[in-house]
């Protein structure tokens, strides 16, 4: 009988830890692109639906790591319990080829950091895939920190860990992502500072 109670407790823990919600704003379509998010900001000015609610519509979060609800007084959003969604992280290779490793932005110090870790522009595809894999896994497990929530949506920070190519060990650093509907996130900041 004790074994059965332990199993029940473990099953309850599994369901509780996988407990996700979706923000829903009645009568509005979710914004799947940054262009649609920007359009929602404009539409909010001519409607009675705020841009924050418009741009979090359809976004999914684990119950133990979600934005404060209600989002504001008189919020029309409601929460729907959902199964853990299929996660998808998007990271454009240009975040590395045209930003991190670009001589145009060399003064921000990010190119030097990645170079010190043994990475160069030729590694952009690898870095893109690594960021996607780690971000999907960590978002799925709720291993992220909520950031700014404003008229453009909810930002989150995810820690990425890379092996240094010159065998100095590993490096961990913050990356910035924007949350989109149905378990989608998109990289906005490929390097936001180191962590211990």
What are these regions (language model features)?
Residues 1-74, 80-125, 129-132, 136:
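Domain-core detector
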Residues 68-75, 181-187:
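Short glycine/proline-enriched turn or capping motifs at secondary-structure junctions
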Residues 83-196:
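Ribonuclease/tRNase effector modules and their secretory precursors
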């Amino acid at each position: 009988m004790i074994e059965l109670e332990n199993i029940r407790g473990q099953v309850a823990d599994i369901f509780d830890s996988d407990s996700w919600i979706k923000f829903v704003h009645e009568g509005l379509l979710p914004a799947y692109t940054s262009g649609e998010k920007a359009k929602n900001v404009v539409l909010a000015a001519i409607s009675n639906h705020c841009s924050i609610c418009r741009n979090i519509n359809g976004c999914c979060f684990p119950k133990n790591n979600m934005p404060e609800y209600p989002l504001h007084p008189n919020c029309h959003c409601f929460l729907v319990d959902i199964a853990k969604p299929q996660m998808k992280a998007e990271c454009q290779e240009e975040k590395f080829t045209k930003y991190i490793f670009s001589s145009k932005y060399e003064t921000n110090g990010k190119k030097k950091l990645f170079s010190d870790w043994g990475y160069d522009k030729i590694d952009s595809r690898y870095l893109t895939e690594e960021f996607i894999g780690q971000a999907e896994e960590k978002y799925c497990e709720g291993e992220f920190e909520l950031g700014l929530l404003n008229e453009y949506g909810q930002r989150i920070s995810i820690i990425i860990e890379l092996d240094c190519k010159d065998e100095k060990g590993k490096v961990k650093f913050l990356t910035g992502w924007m949350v989109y509907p149905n378990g989608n996130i998109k990289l906005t900041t490929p390097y936001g500072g180191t962590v211990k």
